[in-house]
Amino acid sequence: MAAYGGDASSAEARRRSKLSAGPHHRDRELAPLDKDRILSCLGTRWLGRDLRLFAQLASTNELAISLAQKGESGTVILAEVQTRGRGRLSRHWESPSGGIWMSLILRPDIPIALAYQINMAICVAVCRAISNLLGLNPGIKWPNDLLIGERKVGGILMEVQAEGKRLEYAVVGVGINANIDPSAFPDDWMATSLSREVGSEVSRTALIQRTLLEIERAYENLGSKEIYDEWRRRSATIGRMVRISANSGELVGEVEDLAEDGALLLRRDDELVRVLAGDCIHLRGMGGL
Protein backbone atom coordinates (compact mmCIF):
# COMPACT_ATOMS: atom_id res chain seq x y z
CA MET A 1 0.00 0.00 0.00
CA ALA A 2 2.87 2.29 0.60
CA ALA A 3 3.11 2.70 -3.13
CA TYR A 4 1.77 1.46 -6.41
CA GLY A 5 3.54 0.60 -9.62
CA GLY A 6 3.25 -1.38 -12.82
CA ASP A 7 5.61 -3.88 -14.41
CA ALA A 8 9.09 -3.70 -12.90
CA SER A 9 11.50 -1.82 -15.10
CA SER A 10 15.23 -1.92 -14.34
CA ALA A 11 14.81 1.27 -12.30
CA GLU A 12 11.91 -0.29 -10.43
CA ALA A 13 13.98 -3.39 -9.77
CA ARG A 14 16.74 -1.24 -8.29
CA ARG A 15 14.18 0.50 -6.08
CA ARG A 16 12.89 -2.84 -4.84
CA SER A 17 16.44 -3.93 -4.08
CA LYS A 18 16.78 -0.78 -1.99
CA LEU A 19 13.50 -1.61 -0.25
CA SER A 20 14.83 -5.06 0.63
CA ALA A 21 18.04 -3.75 2.14
CA GLY A 22 17.08 -0.27 3.26
CA PRO A 23 16.95 1.16 6.78
CA HIS A 24 13.27 0.34 7.27
CA HIS A 25 14.08 -3.36 7.84
CA ARG A 26 15.52 -2.48 11.26
CA ASP A 27 12.16 -3.36 12.86
CA ARG A 28 12.28 -6.86 11.51
CA GLU A 29 15.85 -7.41 12.72
CA LEU A 30 15.16 -6.13 16.24
CA ALA A 31 11.55 -7.13 16.76
CA PRO A 32 10.11 -9.69 14.36
CA LEU A 33 6.42 -10.31 14.79
CA ASP A 34 5.61 -13.16 17.15
CA LYS A 35 2.25 -14.93 16.99
CA ASP A 36 2.19 -15.81 20.69
CA ARG A 37 2.93 -12.22 21.72
CA ILE A 38 0.16 -10.90 19.51
CA LEU A 39 -2.37 -13.41 20.85
CA SER A 40 -1.32 -13.02 24.49
CA CYS A 41 -2.87 -9.55 24.83
CA LEU A 42 -5.35 -9.60 21.96
CA GLY A 43 -8.61 -8.13 23.23
CA THR A 44 -10.92 -9.46 20.51
CA ARG A 45 -13.56 -12.12 21.09
CA TRP A 46 -13.39 -13.80 17.69
CA LEU A 47 -11.41 -11.78 15.14
CA GLY A 48 -7.84 -13.02 14.79
CA ARG A 49 -8.19 -15.83 17.31
CA ASP A 50 -7.09 -17.94 14.36
CA LEU A 51 -3.96 -15.97 13.44
CA ARG A 52 -1.56 -17.25 10.80
CA LEU A 53 1.79 -15.49 10.60
CA PHE A 54 4.22 -15.91 7.70
CA ALA A 55 7.71 -14.54 7.09
CA GLN A 56 6.81 -14.03 3.44
CA LEU A 57 3.77 -14.49 1.22
CA ALA A 58 2.98 -13.57 -2.33
CA SER A 59 -0.26 -11.94 -1.14
CA THR A 60 -2.15 -12.20 2.15
CA ASN A 61 -5.41 -11.56 0.29
CA GLU A 62 -4.78 -14.45 -2.09
CA LEU A 63 -4.29 -16.90 0.77
CA ALA A 64 -7.25 -15.48 2.68
CA ILE A 65 -9.52 -15.90 -0.35
CA SER A 66 -8.52 -19.55 -0.72
CA LEU A 67 -9.28 -20.13 2.98
CA ALA A 68 -12.58 -18.24 2.75
CA GLN A 69 -13.64 -20.54 -0.07
CA LYS A 70 -13.16 -23.44 2.37
CA GLY A 71 -15.42 -21.84 4.97
CA GLU A 72 -12.95 -20.02 7.23
CA SER A 73 -14.28 -17.06 9.24
CA GLY A 74 -12.57 -14.55 11.52
CA THR A 75 -9.16 -15.80 10.40
CA VAL A 76 -6.35 -13.25 10.06
CA ILE A 77 -3.42 -13.78 7.69
CA LEU A 78 -0.32 -11.74 8.54
CA ALA A 79 2.97 -11.52 6.65
CA GLU A 80 6.27 -9.76 7.31
CA VAL A 81 6.71 -9.27 3.55
CA GLN A 82 4.44 -9.59 0.51
CA THR A 83 6.12 -10.21 -2.84
CA ARG A 84 3.01 -9.73 -4.98
CA GLY A 85 0.85 -7.52 -2.82
CA ARG A 86 -1.79 -5.62 -4.71
CA GLY A 87 -3.93 -2.57 -4.24
CA ARG A 88 -7.05 -1.33 -5.98
CA LEU A 89 -7.29 -1.82 -9.75
CA SER A 90 -4.66 -4.61 -9.50
CA ARG A 91 -1.86 -2.12 -8.88
CA HIS A 92 1.33 -3.29 -7.27
CA TRP A 93 1.41 -2.69 -3.53
CA GLU A 94 4.88 -2.39 -2.00
CA SER A 95 4.97 -4.48 1.18
CA PRO A 96 8.51 -4.54 2.61
CA SER A 97 9.48 -5.64 6.09
CA GLY A 98 8.63 -3.20 8.85
CA GLY A 99 5.03 -2.73 7.78
CA ILE A 100 1.78 -4.41 8.79
CA TRP A 101 0.33 -6.50 5.98
CA MET A 102 -2.71 -8.53 6.95
CA SER A 103 -5.97 -9.87 5.56
CA LEU A 104 -9.19 -10.66 7.42
CA ILE A 105 -11.90 -13.18 6.51
CA LEU A 106 -15.36 -11.85 7.33
CA ARG A 107 -18.84 -13.30 6.78
CA PRO A 108 -21.38 -10.53 7.32
CA ASP A 109 -25.03 -11.44 6.88
CA ILE A 110 -25.83 -8.54 4.56
CA PRO A 111 -26.86 -8.03 0.92
CA ILE A 112 -24.03 -7.50 -1.54
CA ALA A 113 -25.44 -4.00 -2.10
CA LEU A 114 -24.38 -3.07 1.44
CA ALA A 115 -20.78 -4.27 1.09
CA TYR A 116 -19.61 -0.64 1.16
CA GLN A 117 -20.44 -0.65 4.89
CA ILE A 118 -17.53 -3.01 5.50
CA ASN A 119 -14.98 -0.78 3.75
CA MET A 120 -16.34 2.23 5.63
CA ALA A 121 -16.12 0.47 9.01
CA ILE A 122 -12.60 -0.90 8.44
CA CYS A 123 -11.26 2.50 7.35
CA VAL A 124 -12.69 4.11 10.48
CA ALA A 125 -11.39 1.30 12.70
CA VAL A 126 -7.80 1.52 11.44
CA CYS A 127 -7.86 5.31 11.88
CA ARG A 128 -9.12 4.85 15.44
CA ALA A 129 -6.35 2.38 16.23
CA ILE A 130 -3.62 4.70 14.95
CA SER A 131 -5.16 7.70 16.70
CA ASN A 132 -5.70 5.97 20.05
CA LEU A 133 -2.29 4.30 20.14
CA LEU A 134 -0.08 7.01 18.66
CA GLY A 135 -2.00 10.27 18.96
CA LEU A 136 -1.99 10.87 15.21
CA ASN A 137 -5.07 11.93 13.27
CA PRO A 138 -5.32 9.96 10.01
CA GLY A 139 -7.63 11.09 7.25
CA ILE A 140 -9.42 8.93 4.70
CA LYS A 141 -8.90 9.61 1.01
CA TRP A 142 -11.92 8.25 -0.82
CA PRO A 143 -12.49 5.43 -1.13
CA ASN A 144 -9.94 3.57 1.00
CA ASP A 145 -6.54 5.25 1.41
CA LEU A 146 -5.34 6.42 4.82
CA LEU A 147 -3.38 9.67 4.95
CA ILE A 148 -1.32 11.63 7.43
CA GLY A 149 -1.47 15.13 6.02
CA GLU A 150 -1.15 14.64 2.26
CA ARG A 151 0.91 11.45 2.46
CA LYS A 152 -0.32 7.87 2.34
CA VAL A 153 0.29 5.80 5.46
CA GLY A 154 -2.05 2.89 4.79
CA GLY A 155 -4.88 1.48 2.77
CA ILE A 156 -7.67 -1.06 2.54
CA LEU A 157 -8.44 -3.57 -0.21
CA MET A 158 -11.73 -5.46 -0.01
CA GLU A 159 -12.58 -8.43 -2.23
CA VAL A 160 -16.00 -10.05 -1.92
CA GLN A 161 -17.88 -13.13 -3.06
CA ALA A 162 -21.67 -13.17 -3.37
CA GLU A 163 -24.21 -15.97 -3.33
CA GLY A 164 -27.17 -14.57 -5.21
CA LYS A 165 -27.85 -11.15 -3.70
CA ARG A 166 -26.24 -12.01 -0.36
CA LEU A 167 -22.61 -11.58 0.58
CA GLU A 168 -20.94 -14.95 1.07
CA TYR A 169 -17.67 -13.58 2.41
CA ALA A 170 -15.44 -10.52 2.37
CA VAL A 171 -11.66 -10.63 2.45
CA VAL A 172 -10.26 -7.31 3.64
CA GLY A 173 -6.59 -6.49 3.22
CA VAL A 174 -5.13 -3.91 5.58
CA GLY A 175 -1.74 -2.34 4.89
CA ILE A 176 -0.03 0.08 7.26
CA ASN A 177 3.40 1.66 6.79
CA ALA A 178 4.59 1.20 10.35
CA ASN A 179 8.40 1.20 10.61
CA ILE A 180 9.35 1.95 7.02
CA ASP A 181 11.70 4.66 5.83
CA PRO A 182 9.62 6.52 3.21
CA SER A 183 12.77 7.93 1.59
CA ALA A 184 13.18 4.49 0.04
CA PHE A 185 10.18 5.32 -2.16
CA PRO A 186 10.09 7.86 -5.01
CA ASP A 187 8.67 11.25 -4.00
CA ASP A 188 5.75 10.92 -6.42
CA TRP A 189 4.46 7.95 -4.41
CA MET A 190 3.63 10.43 -1.62
CA ALA A 191 4.24 7.88 1.14
CA THR A 192 4.90 8.31 4.83
CA SER A 193 5.14 5.95 7.78
CA LEU A 194 4.02 5.97 11.38
CA SER A 195 7.62 5.88 12.61
CA ARG A 196 8.42 8.96 10.56
CA GLU A 197 5.36 10.79 11.88
CA VAL A 198 6.01 10.04 15.57
CA GLY A 199 9.80 10.21 15.33
CA SER A 200 10.50 6.72 16.67
CA GLU A 201 9.86 3.07 15.98
CA VAL A 202 6.32 1.96 16.80
CA SER A 203 5.27 -1.36 18.29
CA ARG A 204 3.75 -3.34 15.46
CA THR A 205 2.49 -5.91 17.96
CA ALA A 206 0.52 -3.31 19.91
CA LEU A 207 -0.79 -1.74 16.71
CA ILE A 208 -1.97 -5.08 15.32
CA GLN A 209 -3.74 -5.86 18.60
CA ARG A 210 -5.44 -2.46 18.72
CA THR A 211 -6.34 -2.53 15.02
CA LEU A 212 -8.02 -5.93 15.27
CA LEU A 213 -9.93 -4.82 18.37
CA GLU A 214 -11.17 -1.64 16.68
CA ILE A 215 -12.11 -3.59 13.55
CA GLU A 216 -14.12 -6.11 15.56
CA ARG A 217 -15.97 -3.29 17.33
CA ALA A 218 -16.69 -1.39 14.12
CA TYR A 219 -17.70 -4.54 12.26
CA GLU A 220 -20.25 -5.34 14.94
CA ASN A 221 -21.63 -1.83 14.39
CA LEU A 222 -21.95 -2.07 10.59
CA GLY A 223 -24.34 0.39 9.00
CA SER A 224 -24.54 2.65 12.04
CA LYS A 225 -24.77 6.43 11.83
CA GLU A 226 -21.78 6.58 14.18
CA ILE A 227 -19.54 4.84 11.65
CA TYR A 228 -20.77 6.94 8.73
CA ASP A 229 -20.41 10.20 10.66
CA GLU A 230 -16.81 9.43 11.62
CA TRP A 231 -15.96 8.21 8.12
CA ARG A 232 -17.29 11.47 6.73
CA ARG A 233 -15.60 13.58 9.43
CA ARG A 234 -12.24 11.95 8.72
CA SER A 235 -12.56 12.53 4.98
CA ALA A 236 -9.52 14.12 3.37
CA THR A 237 -11.45 14.35 0.10
CA ILE A 238 -14.48 16.53 0.89
CA GLY A 239 -13.86 20.04 -0.43
CA ARG A 240 -11.02 18.95 -2.71
CA MET A 241 -10.70 19.27 -6.45
CA VAL A 242 -10.27 15.72 -7.74
CA ARG A 243 -9.91 13.71 -10.90
CA ILE A 244 -11.96 10.50 -10.96
CA SER A 245 -11.13 7.75 -13.44
CA ALA A 246 -13.96 5.24 -13.80
CA ASN A 247 -15.22 2.78 -16.39
CA SER A 248 -17.50 5.49 -17.76
CA GLY A 249 -14.61 7.90 -18.29
CA GLU A 250 -12.84 10.69 -16.44
CA LEU A 251 -14.49 13.31 -14.24
CA VAL A 252 -12.96 16.45 -12.72
CA GLY A 253 -14.71 18.53 -10.12
CA GLU A 254 -14.97 19.54 -6.48
CA VAL A 255 -16.12 16.98 -3.92
CA GLU A 256 -19.16 18.42 -2.22
CA ASP A 257 -19.90 15.57 0.18
CA LEU A 258 -19.92 11.82 0.79
CA ALA A 259 -23.26 10.02 0.85
CA GLU A 260 -24.34 7.45 3.43
CA ASP A 261 -24.00 4.69 0.83
CA GLY A 262 -20.34 5.59 0.30
CA ALA A 263 -20.86 7.51 -2.92
CA LEU A 264 -18.73 10.55 -3.67
CA LEU A 265 -20.82 13.62 -4.59
CA LEU A 266 -18.91 15.55 -7.23
CA ARG A 267 -19.83 19.09 -8.27
CA ARG A 268 -19.23 19.78 -11.96
CA ASP A 269 -20.50 23.24 -12.90
CA ASP A 270 -24.23 23.08 -12.10
CA GLU A 271 -24.34 19.29 -11.99
CA LEU A 272 -23.96 17.08 -8.90
CA VAL A 273 -22.64 13.65 -9.92
CA ARG A 274 -22.80 10.53 -7.75
CA VAL A 275 -19.66 8.41 -8.08
CA LEU A 276 -19.84 4.94 -6.54
CA ALA A 277 -16.44 3.65 -7.66
CA GLY A 278 -13.33 4.88 -9.37
CA ASP A 279 -9.74 5.95 -8.96
CA CYS A 280 -9.58 9.29 -7.13
CA ILE A 281 -6.65 11.68 -7.48
CA HIS A 282 -6.48 14.79 -5.30
CA LEU A 283 -5.46 17.76 -7.40
CA ARG A 284 -3.06 20.18 -5.78
CA GLY A 285 -4.77 22.95 -3.86
CA MET A 286 -8.44 23.85 -3.83
CA GLY A 287 -8.24 25.27 -7.32
CA GLY A 288 -6.64 22.29 -9.04
CA LEU A 289 -3.17 21.68 -10.42
Regions found by a protein language model. Give the residues of each.
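Long, positively charged amphipathic alpha-helical accessory segments at protein N-termini or as interdomain linkers
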Residues: 3-5, 14-29, 46-47, 112, ...
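Short conserved micro-motifs on helix faces and helix-strand junctions that flank
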Residues: 82-84, 142, 172
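Conserved active-site carboxylates
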Residues: 145
